[in-house]
Amino acid sequence: MAGGRRPAGGAEGEPGAKRARAGGEGGMAAAAAWAAFRALGSPARHVAPMVDGSELAFRMLCRRHGADCAYSPMIHARLFVENQKYRDSYFTTCGEDRPLMAQFCANEPATLLAAAQLLEDRVDMVDLNLGCPQRIAKRGNYGAFLMDDLQRVEAMVSLLSRELKVPVSCKIRIFPEDKPYTQTLAYAKMLERAGCQLLAVHGRTREQKRAADFRADWDAIRAVREHVEIPVLANGDVRHLRDARALMEYTGAVGVLSADPLLRHPGLFDDSVHDAEGNPTHKPWSCCDYAEEYLDLCIQYDTPHRIIVLHMYRFLGDWFKEHHDLREKFSKLHKHLKGEEKFALMREVCDELRERIKACGRSTPVPKLSERALARLEREEAVKAAKEEQDREAQALAEVDAMKARAEGAAVGAGGGGSGAEAATSAGDQGK
């Protein structure tokens, strides 16, 4: 495990682990959960699941720099089962990519199980996304919006726990206006009883979508950790190694997750670029170094172009706010180039930006736009990215429905119902 201070007691000394050894059916299940966590190596520093963010190349970058466990991007269970193209593009891994959690979103137990069984031999745990607060999750009735249907959640977790060969984990958010956290604690306990063996708690509600606007409730995470007997991971406000240590110390969680801050600084968990207190000591131009290292990994692991572009903007975006000409250069080159030429010119932008950062003698950029204008641009980019992901999901679902309609039409035609086949084929074509 990458270095850092373990919270009081550590994994072996957690109150949950002690209660698990007390015996009884619940205690036996909790003991199994702790055994499963230790079998992973008791990882404390986790790359959180991120749509278009935690793909293989980025996971491997973070592992090089201190992360000791990672989640896949959120995988749509129905699409993973029914759409081969989606399945091939949304999950890739390699032998060094361990321990690894595959995260699924779903609202139907049988479909979730079928999807998970396709991957259970390639991952260490299967995770159920119960925390996504975005509009796409509301429309699809998954993620944090299943907090309104806990009976369905219980059925999904219970089925996975009974049928999979690997442990089941869950990632949740907390209920709003819930102090002293009655609903949240009951939710966590239900998941534990259903068979969840590792629980990640994001200390924000589903209404608190933008992390920059709301502080995470560490007290809620601590309350959950004290209430259940299984290992708990904490998520929220981890921007530096110091934050990770503080969150573990405060909540007693066995580990932490980080998402957006890792996108900007993949060395967030790296002891070598932090001082003894966990304060960052990396050079201002380290963003360029990470970007070029990431490009090498993208070639090695054949990463989709749109994913590369998103990551490059995250790495370099803060300094692009000062150096607009380089942002424009990058924007134009990635749209019109392919292959080795594209990567060469991306590196050229990185090299030029690195020299400018060194020359300016500052550790932070001086944006050309006002804070209000920058905030507006960030909101617009977030909305655009969410809309693009929603459109991709809708298109993939339409392709699945179209294939089903054509298959049903062919079956009807083979049975002598030609008109039915034509109708089904027509319906399928309209779904393209």
Region spans (language model):
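Alpha/beta catalytic cores of nucleotide-metabolism and tRNA/nucleoside-modifying enzymes
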Residues: A2-H46, V51, L56-M60, R64, ...
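Glycine-rich, positively charged N-terminal anion/phosphate-binding segment
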Residues: G23-A39, M50-E120, K329-S331
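N-terminal small/glycine-rich loop or linker at the start of catalytic domains
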Residues: W34-A44, R78-P99, C132, K138-N141, ...
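Active-site beta-loop-alpha junctions enriched in small/polar residues
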Residues: M50-D52, I75-A77, C105-N107, G131-P133, ...
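Conserved beta-strand positions in the central sheet of alpha/beta enzyme cores
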Residues: A70-Y71, M101-Q103, D127-N129, S169, ...
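Alpha/beta enzyme core
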Residues: L113-Y142, L150-I230, R245-A246
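Short glycine-enriched, charge-decorated loop/helix-capping segments at active-site entrances
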Residues: N141-M147, R210, V273-P280
